[in-house]
């Protein structure tokens, strides 16, 4: 009997593994024709590096991007472009293949022209900032590698081009993208950008009345140097050239094969340093290059483990469902390319933006362009990139996002004290990577007596609560994976303290009492996202405060002597307000508000992300009524960009609507790479479009409430699926739905199986 049991377990394990491998290979992106331009590029990356890879007119191109490469204006600069040319050219014939090999995390390109055949492997070392290009051919070729830069001279940016930086529509004088330093050195091409002493940080500090604190404020742009070197063992310097790609002039620095060869290996090592001396940066770069080994095995293992950790593979008769499953995996690949980034993955393009005129023909700017800035962090967008990482078990990948806020904590507290004289960290929605409001959104044309802590902005005024979603994510990593979150407790506590201190401060300015007649904070003025403005007791803020406070109080990391303080604050948070449509009770966006300014539905934030309403919880009918009858919610409904309607539908168990909206969101993008969605409200590839799609698919498949785990709460019975997702309390759930029946369920630890509720036939 024991032998039979062992055989069955072994067989099941092998069967699971083989089906995962097959499903993953099926999701590989394969092109058999070359691309027309960079918009038809393929993402490749690893660690904190992203490449756009494409072959155009027989030449191989790569854009180089890396996390944290911010210039003086807070543009997230690319690190240049590589162009590979070959003689004789195997890519001048009719036989061609380019493939993204998801399982191992790299791309291959093969071509044949007459008798000559060649294959190129492009991969990034997950653990070192090094790009490898392996070129193999059946006959000797001469390879030319051209490092191309559009930053060979200073470039004045005007008009909409400044949307790529922190000045946006309100530049203060002439704004320039400063040139890079590029030269042949040490047998290769060395390139770097060194930030000048004066940056947008200094301009913003002065604008917001914080000059006296300038030397104590955290400044990530100061002394920043970033770049790299391109080398090849059989490559020598071969002079310069110049040209124009699309509308952007460039200059090139060429390396060429010393002698024709059947194999070449190009190495591009990158380095980012905070140092005032270029020599220090060069020393670090040299060390990185010396330790760069052409050994892909560790990176392959990382990608293999990444895919085995979590997946959703759909096999349905509905092609839209199949596309959703595939694009879920493709987008997760893009997220994995910034697993160890110094900065979080940007919602507006991540590491994979391309020439802007291919998105909007009027924007004939450089490849550095992205709408909504480089160093500007827009919290309502960013959150959608990071929430799905809980159910995929990618807790390590959430660290850059958490550390982003932790690094800015001191600045946010200084800002609060300077403006209002009380405690707490005030984080705004449009937040710079140094913790102050974006200067354009803050407003240059302000009444003389307008408070320095406030943004003079109809969309953003009084929107303080977006940081609380990141506080909740931190707390959830502890609940999901027993992560040690002690270092983040000051961030969570200071963010909560701001609300207590600030709304007592405002109440005392209006009158003698700090609280209302029921002993609650008066959350006025507030904001329901960017939509319901000058709100009194905004529902999104109330839901956020209640949920974060409850989670903090329950956290084992919170010192016992702190629990009474936060329990007392929880008692001061007012209740959610309601209103009626067609005699149906619905959740109101606030108790009162003055105007509607945008197209969000924060009245449903108690459903997601805050989970106050949902399957198996009191008031589900009220939340469903809000989704179905609230005229604003109906008017704002969409699947585009950051819209969350698919997530709301899934959380409410509305299978048909969840499937419709999620497949619309996750269907092929219309671009050559299926997961390059956008621009939506932001930019292409739109990462908050992909993130909200991921969340929706996950919530359709599995939800949790305390210890309970609901399977298929909004999943169509005819969508066959093999999945593996994470639940709270260090739990993984893997299984298959086949012909409407759950088979092969695997729950770890096994003790959690009793908490599973299969809803496929009960809804």
Description of each model-found segment:
Residues 24-444, 542, 550, 560-632, ...:
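Aromatic-residue-lined binding/catalytic grooves and analogous aromatic/hydrophobic interfacial grooves
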Residues 325-326, 376-381, 393, 461-469, ...:
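Aromatic- and histidine-enriched alpha-helix N-cap/loop-to-helix transition segments
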Residues 1-24:
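Bacterial Sec-dependent N-terminal signal peptides
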Residues 472-508, 565-594, 613-733, 737-738:
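Non-catalytic carbohydrate-binding regions of carbohydrate-active enzymes
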Residues 352-376, 427-486, 500-567, 743:
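The feature captures the catalytic groove of carbohydrate-active enzymes
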Residues 394, 518-519, 654-657:
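Loop/turn elements at helix/coil->beta-strand transitions in domains of secreted/extracellular proteins
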Residues 312, 333-338, 384-396, 469-482, ...:
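Well-ordered alpha-helical scaffold segments within catalytic/enzyme domains
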Residues 113-119, 125-130, 139, 151, ...:
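A conserved hydrophobic secondary-structure block that centers on an alpha-helix together
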């Amino acid at each position: 009997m024991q032998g039979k049991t062992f055989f069955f377990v072994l067989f099941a394990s092998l069967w699971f593994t083989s089906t995962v491998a097959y499903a993953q290979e099926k999701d590989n992106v394969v092109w058999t024709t070359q691309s027309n331009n960079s918009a038809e590029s393929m993402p490749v990356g690893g660690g904190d590096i992203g490449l756009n890879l494409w072959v155009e007119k027989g030449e191989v191109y790569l854009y180089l991007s890396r996390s944290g490469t911010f210039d003086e204006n807070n543009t997230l600069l690319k690190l240049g472009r590589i162009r590979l040319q070959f003689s004789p050219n195997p890519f001048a014939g009719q036989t061609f293949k380019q493939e993204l090999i998801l399982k191992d995390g790299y791309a291959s390109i093969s071509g044949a022209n007459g008798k000559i055949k060649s294959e190129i492997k492009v991969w990034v070392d997950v653990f070192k900032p090094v790009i490898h290009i392996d070129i193999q051919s059946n006959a000797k070729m001469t390879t030319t590698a051209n490092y191309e830069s559009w930053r060979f001279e200073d470039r004045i940016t005007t008009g909409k081009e400044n949307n790529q930086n922190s000045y946006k529509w309100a530049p203060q004088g002439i704004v320039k993208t400063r040139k890079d330093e590029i030269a042949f050195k040490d047998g290769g091409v060395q390139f770097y950008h060194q930030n000048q002493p004066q940056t947008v940080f200094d301009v913003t500090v002065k604008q917001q009345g914080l000059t006296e604190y300038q030397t104590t404020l955290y400044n990530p742009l100061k002394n920043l140097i970033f770049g790299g070197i391109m080398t090849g063992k059989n490559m020598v310097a071969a002079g310069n050239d110049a040209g124009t790609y699309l509308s952007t002039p460039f200059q090139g620095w060429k390396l060429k094969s010393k002698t024709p060869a059947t194999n070449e290996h190009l190495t591009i090592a990158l380095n980012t340093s905070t140092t005032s001396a270029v020599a220090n940066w060069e020393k670090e770069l040299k060390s990185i290059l010396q330790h760069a080994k052409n050994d892909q095995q560790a990176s392959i293992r990382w990608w293999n483990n990444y895919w085995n950790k979590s997946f959703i593979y759909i096999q349905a008769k509905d092609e839209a469902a199949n596309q959703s499953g595939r694009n879920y995996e493709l987008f997760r690949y893009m997220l994995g390319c910034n697993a160890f980034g110094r900065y979080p993955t940007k919602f507006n393009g991540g590491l994979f933006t391309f020439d802007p005129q291919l998105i909007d023909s009027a924007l004939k700017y450089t490849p550095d362009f992205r709408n909504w800035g480089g160093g500007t962090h827009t919290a309502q967008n960013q959150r959608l990139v990071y929430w799905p990482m809980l159910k995929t078990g990618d807790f390590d990948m959430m660290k850059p996002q958490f550390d982003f806020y932790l690094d800015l904590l001191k600045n946010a507290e200084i800002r609060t004290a300077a403006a209002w004289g009380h405690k707490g960290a005030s984080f705004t929605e449009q937040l710079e990577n140094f913790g102050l409001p974006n200067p354009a959104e803050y407003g240059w044309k302000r009444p003389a007596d307008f408070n320095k802590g406030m943004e003079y902005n109809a969309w953003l005024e009084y929107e303080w609560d977006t940081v609380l979603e990141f506080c909740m994510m931190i707390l959830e990593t502890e609940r999901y994976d027993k992560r040690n979150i002690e270092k983040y407790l000051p961030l969570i506590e200071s963010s909560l303290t701001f609300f207590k201190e600030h709304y007592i401060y405002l109440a005392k300015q209006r009158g003698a009492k700090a609280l209302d007649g029921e002993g609650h904070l008066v959350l006025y003025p507030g904001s329901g996202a960017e939509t319901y403005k000058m709100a009194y007791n905004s529902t999104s803020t109330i839901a956020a405060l209640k949920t974060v406070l409850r989670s903090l109080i329950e956290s084992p990391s919170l010192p016992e002597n702190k629990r009474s303080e936060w329990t007392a604050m929880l008692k001061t948070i007012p209740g959610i307000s309601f209103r009626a449509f067609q005699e149906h009770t619905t959740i109101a966006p606030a108790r009162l508000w003055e105007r509607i300014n945008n197209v969000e539905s924060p009245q449903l934030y108690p459903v997601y992300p805050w989970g106050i309403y949902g399957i198996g919880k009191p008031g589900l009918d009220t939340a469903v009524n809000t989704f179905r009858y609230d005229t604003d919610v109906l008017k704002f409904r969409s699947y585009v960009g950051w819209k969350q309607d698919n997530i709301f539908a899934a959380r409410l168990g509305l299978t048909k609507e969840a499937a419709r909206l999620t497949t619309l969101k996750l269907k092929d993008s219309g671009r050559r790479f299926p997961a390059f969605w956008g621009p939506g409200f932001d930019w292409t590839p739109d990462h908050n479009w992909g993130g909200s799609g991921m969340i929706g698919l996950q919530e359709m498949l599995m939800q949790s409430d305390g210890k309970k785990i609901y399977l298929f709460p909004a999943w169509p019975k005819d969508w066959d699926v093999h999945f593996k997702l994470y639940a709270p309390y260090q739990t993984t759930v893997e299984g298959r739905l086949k012909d409407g029946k759950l088979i092969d369920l695997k729950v770890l630890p096994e003790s959690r199986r009793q908490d599973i509720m299969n809803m496929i036939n009960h809804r």
